[in-house]
């Protein structure tokens, strides 16, 4: 049993000692079975939320009505959720009501995919009622039970299925795929924010190529913000190794380059996904300096976006980042005498004092002239030299 589970075992033992059932569930169990790095460890129990709160000193109520309580244990936090059954779903995204139960198999039955519906006991025994281990062996993404029922309960599950394709390198099982084609329009009931989370995870997956192609082939792409009508561009984008880029703004910038949108449309597209303003701004900066130019003035104007543009260019051309070349670009950038106007050894206030003039457009124009001369290597970035240069300029 991995260390992540060992650290959480006292919670299971504490619940069991009080007469309750308790198991590890979800993604951590899946990743353990697949010998992958384990993320958050979640626990399912027959204890009610109130009983969980009584048993543990430090808890946080994050949704008791849905059965979930956070337990703080040593330096970790664990989601402890009561076994539950769900009534009919409303709006294709949440159940009308939740009923607490005492059956683990009934609890696991309501989960989205077989690979996520496995549990593990305190002794390390795998409990797999729905063939998750078999599907992992076959590298298949399959829903628990009828796929149409699962997708009508929560339409986001269609995106989750394709996202796991990208992360795990699995294929969509035939019936699950057919249900996506049939029910894809239900995704309209899901908030943009939830779609964005899944789409960004998909782009980060090592098998995003197959996942993007599946989204196009099933028509799922048509239900995503701003992508209907861009099927061909998305097929071209599918061959790009998005997972090789570290920052989310870099992945969005790369996607924009494949879509071929003008700056105004590109910004509107990013806003449709309800991305943070900072991410939008950075992505727009990257595409504005792409393809990267390595002249001093161009590098200066590009700033930090230069490196993102260089990486995207390498990946588009060679599918890999040449770290040595990237270091050479970074070295060239570091050799710039200034990285921003603030780095000039003279300020607008200095100029006003020197000229004995009030503020006006002339200050920005003069700073721009100094900036150009410093970048071109014609003028050292020292106040004394700049003043001398300005004096000689005045005499011309």
UniProtKB/Swiss-Prot annotation:
It catalyses: a tRNA precursor + 2 CTP + ATP = a tRNA with a 3' CCA end + 3 diphosphate; a tRNA with a 3' CCA end + 2 CTP + ATP = a tRNA with a 3' CCACCA end + 3 diphosphate. ATP binds at residues 27, 30, 111, 154, 157, 160, 163. CTP binds at residues 27, 30, 111, 154, 157, 160, 163. Transmembrane segments: none annotated. Mg(2+) binds at residues 40, 42. GO terms for molecular function: ATP binding; CCA tRNA nucleotidyltransferase activity; magnesium ion binding; tRNA binding. The keyword Nucleotide-binding applies. Gene3D superfamilies: 1.10.110.30, 1.10.246.80, 1.20.58.560, Beta Polymerase, domain 2 (3.30.460.10). It is an enzyme of class 2 (transferase). SUPFAM superfamilies: Nucleotidyltransferase, Poly A polymerase C-terminal region-like. Keywords: ATP-binding, Magnesium, Metal-binding, Nucleotide-binding, Nucleotidyltransferase, RNA repair, RNA-binding, Transferase, tRNA processing. Its EC number is 2.7.7.72. It comes from the Bacteria. Its cofactor is Mg(2+). GO terms for biological process: RNA repair; tRNA 3'-terminal CCA addition. Homodimer. HAMAP family: CCA_bact_type3 (MF_01263). A single active site specifically recognizes both ATP and CTP and is responsible for their addition. Catalyzes the addition and repair of the essential 3'-terminal CCA sequence in tRNAs without using a nucleic acid template. Adds these three nucleotides in the order of C, C, and A to the tRNA nucleotide-73, using CTP and ATP as substrates and producing inorganic pyrophosphate. tRNA 3'-terminal CCA addition is required both for tRNA processing and repair. Also involved in tRNA surveillance by mediating tandem CCA addition to generate a CCACCA at the 3' terminus of unstable tRNAs. While stable tRNAs receive only 3'-terminal CCA, unstable tRNAs are marked with CCACCA and rapidly degraded. Belongs to the tRNA nucleotidyltransferase/poly(A) polymerase family. Bacterial CCA-adding enzyme type 3 subfamily. NCBIfam families: PRK13299.1. This is CCA-adding enzyme. It comes from Bacillus velezensis (strain DSM 23117 / BGSC 10A6 / LMG 26770 / FZB42) (Bacillus amyloliquefaciens subsp. plantarum). The lineage of its organism: Bacteria, Bacillati, Bacillota, Bacilli, Bacillales.
